[in-house]
Amino acid sequence: VPSFTGTIPSAFLGFEPAIDGTADDVVIEVALAPIDGPGGILGQAGPRYVHNEFLTLTGVMFFDVADLAFLESLDLFEEVIVHEMGHVLGVGTLWNVEHYGYPRTLREGPDSNPYFNGHKGNVHWNAEGGLGELPIENEGGPGTRLSHWRESSMNNELMTGYLNLGENPLSRITAGSLKDLGYGTSNKGESYDLPKGTPGVDISEFAESNEGQGLNIAKMEIILEPIGLVTNE
């Protein structure tokens, strides 16, 4: 990410600034605190201050202490952390920012059948065996639809709105989508098995996810939008 010199306030009242000097990386502040008790909101996450290219400079992640034991019992806490980091970096949060005056529209199509139009993300989607365009979630509530990969197509990939028991790999598809956002990330990803011929946005019917075998994280998270824009050196 670009270098920034200046002062950026903490997301938390009474704490030292998140940045006070020069930063050439993303700074993520994390808090474990009560939110709403067990079984409700697991966490909140998103970019806070962004560069003028709409790459994240600082972000924040809150996790509800009342849900930590539950997540540990499912062996999913680490996956939840990395999933929320994805949102901080811009997955589902910085795809479309034209309403801020910056010409980036990585999510296209109707809300009923949205897709990701970034070149790198689609190269890896097709290389993994997917057909058509990389599908974005079209079902669920406001925290699910339009801000995750489509569960019915991508199953256990980490950035769908549903975390499966067992492995939830961060695939080359997500890594490629970060390059489409503008990050200088590697194209490497964890081992991910997408059946060849998996349909993308051209499909007309979608498989139902089995909520008995994992965690619908998208129903239990609040995705935050950026609050400030900084000018780079």
Segments the model singles out, each with a brief description of its role:
Residues 1-82, 88-233:
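Extracellular zinc-dependent metalloprotease catalytic-domain scaffold
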